Curated annotation (Swiss-Prot):
Protein name: Large ribosomal subunit protein eL31
Gene Ontology CC, one term: cytosolic large ribosomal subunit
Keyword NAD attributed: no
HAMAP family, per database record: Ribosomal_eL31
SMART domains (UniProt xref): Ribosomal_L31e
Gene Ontology molecular-function annotations: structural constituent of ribosome
Gene3D superfamilies assigned: 3.10.440.10
Coiled coil: none
UniProt keyword Ribonucleoprotein, yes or no: yes
Organism per entry: Methanoculleus marisnigri (strain ATCC 35101 / DSM 1498 / JR1)
GO terms, biological process: cytoplasmic translation
């Protein structure tokens, strides 16, 4: 893998997910994380790591976390890869 041009740690709020129906909250959280990274990293090509998915779905679809801490890396080709940031 090439060197990362930009690397940021974001704390992504997922408050708005609670407005979705209970059975859609997990999927909505993943979509919101991807949309946040598209907006802040200025790239449409966003890949989420398996660890982010596991964290969101940890308590099931109806109870995603209120916020999530993510490390995002943007590469030369414009691709953004995101993984769960260690605390």
């Amino acid at each position: 893998m090439a060197e990362a041009l930009k690397e940021h740690i974001y704390i992504i709020p997922l408050r708005e997910v609670k407005r979705a129906p209970r059975w859609k909250r997990g999927n909505t959280a993943i979509k919101d994380i991807r949309a946040f990274l598209v907006r802040h990293m200025k790239s449409e090509d966003v890949k989420l790591d398996k660890s982010i998915n596991e964290k969101v779905w940890e308590n099931g679809s109806s109870k995603p976390p209120r916020k999530i801490r993510v490390r995002a890396m943007k590469f030369e080709d414009g691709q953004v890869q995101a993984e769960l940031a260690e605390e």
